[in-house]
Amino acid sequence: MPPDREEAGRRPAAILIAGPTASGKSALAARLAERHGGVVINTDSMQVYADLRRLTARPDPDEEARVPHRLYGHVDGAVNYSAGHFSRDAAALLATLGGRLPVFVGGTGLYFRALEQGFSELPPVPDTVRARVRDAAEGRPTEALHADLARHDPEGAARLRPSDRMRVMRALEIFLATGRPIASFYGDPVPGPLAGRDLRRIFLAPDRAALRERIDARFRTMIAEGALDEVARLRARRLDPMLPVMRAHGVPGLIAHLDGALSLDEAIARGQADTRAYAKRQLTWFRHQMGEAWRWVDPEGATVEDLL
């Protein structure tokens, strides 16, 4: 339902638009920014990377030229970019907008949380420790790594799914680098740049069946428009396979295809399935984690006038 009359007559400090992948967030954000002289600000953890415009469905150059877009493709794939990096970049950007309306859009819940609730600063991990954990993980199931973590940091292990390889390895790195459990660094978060501000929070919740169809169709369109070539260039860089850019939806399967382990159709099917599963997790996470301050909107019936 539309906002009440008092709320609708008051311009917010920022608009936040979230939703599952392929729900139409980017197009809506561009329309809102164009209508109100705003700036679209990426809030998606994969669209920050310069290496994967097509595979992450970043706005194309024409779209970016029509209305200002920021924090898209500004990070090299070799960087392990985090919610903390994003929050600092967003704070610096907000200071330059000169009164223009910021429209944050994306699907990464932790980035939205960092904007309002802040983030905990984790210590740097030496490359030698990263290499030690990576070597220890080679050929071992994630559940075994989780058991290793439980011996060193039972509280940290209890917070993580035994199948969440990236976060389990990160917690192991922190413990080995500092001798402290990862939770000990969570007590004093850095404030978020939008904390206490007047915000419009919109979550796009499309029909599930229609969303699955859009995800599958979009993945094939990405391939037709050059996503496989993007992944080939990324593969040639020989980056650490645990980096976020190497784990983007579609990348592992397409690399397996380039290595001869999968047919292209098999790689596409894997990418589609991974993306559908991710969309389901996004819906679940926002429903349980972000509270009632967010308006859930069917994108099929949403208009710019309804949302501001």
UniProtKB/Swiss-Prot annotation:
EC number: 2.5.1.75
Amino acids binding substrate: 21-26
Pfam families hit by this protein: IPPT
Residues that bind ATP: 19-26
Major enzyme class: transferase
Cofactor list: Mg(2+)
GO biological process, any: tRNA modification
Quaternary structure and interacting proteins, as annotated: Monomer.
Function summary: Catalyzes the transfer of a dimethylallyl group onto the adenine at position 37 in tRNAs that read codons beginning with uridine, leading to the formation of N6-(dimethylallyl)adenosine (i(6)A).
HAMAP family: IPP_trans (MF_00185)
Family that this chain belongs to: Belongs to the IPP transferase family.
Protein name per the record: tRNA dimethylallyltransferase
The organism of origin for this protein: Methylobacterium radiotolerans (strain ATCC 27329 / DSM 1819 / JCM 2831 / NBRC 15690 / NCIMB 10815 / 0-1)
